[in-house]
């Protein structure tokens, strides 16, 4: 994997670039739809390609490990062979999911024991077997296995957690270097910067990660309940240290406003379940504001969902989508999910254009003001 930094904004830290993988190029800034179990919920890959224009999707190591399981994925030739997606894939390490299993997990220096949320069976994730698992899944970008401490952890817990995450990172890198890709395409490993909301821990973590010389770096443990201004401050602290010639990935974030603010602070890659989750709940982001498609006000509105959006936005009226939600039709959630994902991809594409034009900061300010409206 390579990263070419193309443009840097004169008035902010926003930048554009191109990530090149064996499965294709990714223009940054980029939003990555989340395909937890190897699929993006409610959206066919053909729609992801043509309507959403997704350049890369995510897979979830925890969920894929449990179901369908590694034997099936390996027999299919990796996740690309199993699900038929021919563009880049990134897999998280499963750490966030495992550490969300409060009460059914046990943490130690070795790794994390946990019970499956499916059948209660017992498993363990270690830095070594997570690297092996991600090799079998075969994603173009693999994430290191880290501990994800609760967002409001006290300083001592956060420090202890970070120290273990750093030891685990060394083990991940060692295992990664000892193993080879299984399916004929290269894979890259991204370390993750943790440290909760403590500046000194974030700086320490960023320096530790930067020194590893990885192909790209991630920022984790944010958007977990802290005020947004604190999140932005942590991004600034970390990006002052992370190398400028490598892509920076902010994990699990977030709203359109969050994404634009993070782009301004030098972040290149994003993922979040919000587009599909909010879409399934009838809440639609647009450049004019947020619409609740269950509201009666749309009952007789025959204008397009978004006249400047993807093809489905243009041919579907607000009244029709309102009707589908009120009738409980699955098509409503599908249309809304496609709209949302296409909107997120359009947002980062427009951000890229304005960074190149040199007016990103002004454009962002006007867009954020509109995005906050309820219509």
Model segments located where?
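Glycine-rich phosphate/ribose-binding loops and adjacent secondary-structure elements
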Residues: 163-166, 179, 184-305
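A non-catalytic, amphipathic alpha-helix used as a structural packing/dimerization or gating element
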Residues: 129, 133-136, 160, 164-171, ...
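Short secondary-structure capping/turn micro-motifs that flank functional sites
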Residues: 65, 150-151, 225-226, 278-279, ...
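Non-catalytic, usually N-terminal nucleic-acid engagement modules in DNA/RNA processing proteins
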Residues: 1-182, 296-298
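Structural signal for hydrophobic packing residues in well-ordered secondary-structure cores
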Residues: 138, 169, 173-176, 180, ...
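Conserved, mostly hydrophobic/aromatic
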Residues: 24, 57, 92, 134, ...
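Glycine- and acidic
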Residues: 151-155, 159, 216-222, 330-333
